[in-house]
Amino acid sequence: MAHKKAMGSTENTRDSNPSYLGVKSYGGEHVHAGSIIVRQRGTKFHPGHNVGRGSDDTLFAKDHGVVKFARSGGDRKYVHVVPEEA
């Protein structure tokens, strides 16, 4: 038996960083323009009124208001931002 480990023993020590995906602002919460609402991979949630979609499918608020989650048609889920009235 070898008393020293063979080369390559530390091959499996790498790990990727966490993505921190999920809903960041829930329904009924107040958000400012530019606030991230959902971090996701793919379009589990689709952008609705006053909501934009980033290149990595992140949904963000385009206007100040209240977050609202809704279902439309089949199983498609939308996220809207209802503007606050001054």
UniProtKB/Swiss-Prot annotation:
Residues 1-24 are annotated as: Disordered. GO terms for molecular function: structural constituent of ribosome. It comes from Salinibacter ruber (strain DSM 13855 / M31). PANTHER family: LARGE RIBOSOMAL SUBUNIT PROTEIN BL27M, RIBOSOMAL PROTEIN L27. InterPro entries: Ribosomal_bL27 (IPR001684), Ribosomal_bL27_CS (IPR018261). GO terms for cellular component: cytosolic large ribosomal subunit. SUPFAM superfamilies: Ribosomal L27 protein-like. The keyword Ribosomal protein applies. It holds the Pfam family Ribosomal_L27. GO terms for biological process: translation. The keyword rRNA-binding does not apply. Residues 9-19 have a biased composition (Polar residues). This is Large ribosomal subunit protein bL27. It comes from the Bacteria. NCBIfam families: L27 (TIGR00062).
